[in-house]
Amino acid sequence: MPRPLKMSYGDQKPPYSYISLTAMAIIHSPQRLLPLSEIYRFIMDQFPFYRKNTQKWQNSLRHNLSFNDCFIKVPRNVTKAGKGSYWTLHPMAFDMFENGSLLRRRKRFRVKQLEKDISNWKLAAAANTEMVTHYLDDQLTQMAFADPARHGHVLANASAAQMSPYKATPPILPTTVTQLPARPKRAFTIESLMAPDPASTPNEGLVPMEYGSPDAVALEKPPFNLPFNFNELAAQYQLYFPSFFYNGQYGNIPCYQKTPPLFHNGPLPVF
């Protein structure tokens, strides 16, 4: 984590970049995300230099927020009062400052467009269910397990979330399988083809079979082989995007079950 702040600059300009000032405000917030107005307030409260000429430096800071991948825009929950979105640090950017010093930053943090789209989609879904803080904690915990030496200092302030794979509810299988009656054979003539079928009772010709019998298994097999297996596809998707599956520990919350489906054919929304 960043070192304690030095508050003795007085009216002098502190030696921090706008990226460092913004990261400083976000890191010191309880939920690690703030609206733009709160970021401004934190900077002015800590550094008197920024209490004057506010329009100039606020425009520059807002420009840095929009054009740096280390910051993520989180939509505001519709149930909360106020306007404007929240801002937070990308989960992989919490350690972008060398040795925890906000004065020294590593090379510019960049994120691939696909990863950015997926992250925006997840944060939008988390904002609708008020789970943004849990999402950030889970991302930090996964990073620490992947590289404990590098991300050990981040775990100090990240709650240890229990990760559990996505589990689908097994379908309810029927106890019996009913075989449909075969249509009676008839001569290949116009009169025969246009004639109605002979009357029969609703259950006549239906042969009940026990589930699991050879005849029932033969009826359950599709007439062709599918080009892929859905479970295998889901396993491969989880391999390349492990954090795309939500944690099962929040699955019992009613509002949490209203999130968009995990798999869809349309493009990922960009916020």
Curated annotation (Swiss-Prot):
This is Fork head domain-containing protein FD5. InterPro entries: Fork_head_dom, FOX_domain-containing, TF_fork_head_CS_1, TF_fork_head_CS_2, WH-like_DNA-bd_sf, WH_DNA-bd_sf. Pfam families: Forkhead (PF00250). Transmembrane segments: none annotated. The gene is fd96Cb. Residues 12-103 bind DNA. One of its GO terms (molecular function) is DNA-binding transcription factor activity, RNA polymerase II-specific. One of its GO terms (cellular component) is nucleus.
